[in-house]
């Protein structure tokens, strides 16, 4: 009786008959019970339209279905029942399946029909999802009737989706299951639900192309093909080019291997498999609860602020629209304390749905077998929800399923979109096209920097990061010789270095980078990469950055550069053409070698001018010098110098007659400890042990200059104890000043070789006075850093041989009015015997045959450019004294370099 009254006078019944009357009056159609179509006119209208997806739109954001899908499939499973349910299910590949079920069919019946149609074995990871009137997504409960769960219909629209994302995709045994997982992840990324970094998105898209299209064939496949696919919501042309480049690296992978690589890459994403639900806290702010295999994540906006592991959650219940979580955490003392968190949702139905999803996630990922679903208590006196997890767990799905021998399935092609209109334009102008696409989407990085045209359009374009495009270009490809005119990068970065440009010449033991002059190339190799180098004059323009204004021909640009070069070099005088010794057979001329870049000259400092004057004074007086020159036992045949000729470096001619004696103005020399430490890159507070010990050695004085054993030590006096005595005081005390000459050697004049005075050492050097202790020649044998100069010695160094230079001895002049910081240096030679170094200053030892001696002067010398701020000194009174002073200075500089 109650059923009759409900069926006759119920609200649903009255609405149904009202629709039937309206349909009969309008089109002659009635309800399905009156012989009309299933669901009446509303159902007929809804069957022609696409259903809404769980995300709130017809399809995921990003436009249209992911795959093309197939023809609509109809499954009649109602049997002989008169009343049927009409359900429409949309699969992951875009196929629509319509199913007729009995009136009281449950969710399990519909799910079994879909699984049977797909021929799917691992069914525990999937489910059917639908939307309610509030556009909230719900999972179809397999244990309840469909009509009681879905209030919108008929027809009932559902979506077949992945419900539980496997924590380890390698546990998925079926290839078809992995294929469905890939389709689901592609849906999530395209809709924006699953966020992934740029590089990861590029790699995943390349794997999709490899799985669907196979190998990347360069003549057939182009970047235009990638633009026909959709992988992320905001897909740019720059990203498509990167996908194409990555696709070429996936060569050799089968579709199954590419899909497995896709899953193994996607499982490391932060939001992989996270089921997000929006809630509100007690403060009224919105939060997001994410259900994962390990626990519940809490997000505030995009920031993760908490994680509750499943073992730590002791209680989770709901009451109306309020969800309560009780979490156990250990305090500082190791005691467990309970913390209660309360969240609110929009409605009681939404709150219950979140609670059910949390229970299912916990049971599927944490339990081995589901608990007993039947309760001992009666349903009449039971409080709360009767929902219990009824499916299989992940452990059962992984260990309990059987493998099929064979299984076949068809991979549906992805939906294609029209390619970009300017893809052909990008092929001919890749740099400009990259700039255009980077402006449209600033979030995606540019695979090429912006292009500043400073070359005439008729010239072929070049860029240092030009991609290796495989498709044919309409413009000719630049060869290595054609690319030479574009050796300078417009944006001031590193130049394009090839085998033809950017050569580095290695002279001696240091790398000196020279500037190459040619008619067609100009390559700047600057050591200072922190900022552009500018010319010394403040008014001169920078040479490392060209003006990106009006395009000009390269000839005009070369003329402009040459003009700037002449303007900047004008202050330093003309530079000789650089001679490049390619065959290494001919010796370079002295005047053709330089340590400075011709395009970037530095202004001539005062202290440099002083040394230049000295060198020119010596050249002017060389013709007046008489006498022989003291020769050493070993003659340096291949003597080389990396410094520039003094005649070239000197800006103005100097007359010898203008020199005045320097006795009237004694030189005041600055402290030398800091200069020495700066010269040899030593720290004043952290010197090497040998050098630190040499600092403390007190200099001994002697009046006998003809002793048999003479030792030259190199102390580093501090400014407090440094004493520079004038020549008059040194003569009064019986001491020989560094620039003095011995009475026995006063009459012996000597000449210089052509390159002797070309060593430009403007940096001051510490005092070196004679001592009496003989030691080995290098610092590894004795702490005091001394050089033995004994005439007859048989001391053999027990260490491996080292490279050294031949040091010549020069007489000392006591009448020299200039105070010199260097003492007399006896002759120094080094011989090899049995891989040991023997130091002997004079003639060779009779124990060692002359045939076994190998002069060390054949080794390439080391030249170091020294920049100082030494004050200029006055000119010498005569050319003879200047020459002697420079010669001794050069000799002691070599001695110090050999020791250090």
Curated annotation (Swiss-Prot):
GO terms for cellular component: apical part of cell; bicellular tight junction; cytoplasm; cytoskeleton; cytosol; plasma membrane. Residues 85-369 form the FERM domain. Gene3D superfamilies: 1.20.80.10, Phosphatidylinositol 3-kinase Catalytic Subunit, Chain A, domain 1, Pleckstrin-homology domain (PH domain)/Phosphotyrosine-binding domain (PTB). PANTHER family: 4.1 G PROTEIN, BAND 4.1-LIKE PROTEIN 4B. This is Band 4.1-like protein 4B. The keyword Phosphoprotein applies. Residues 23-48, 400-425, 492-519, 528-547, 706-750 are annotated as: Disordered. Residues 535-547 have a biased composition (Polar residues).
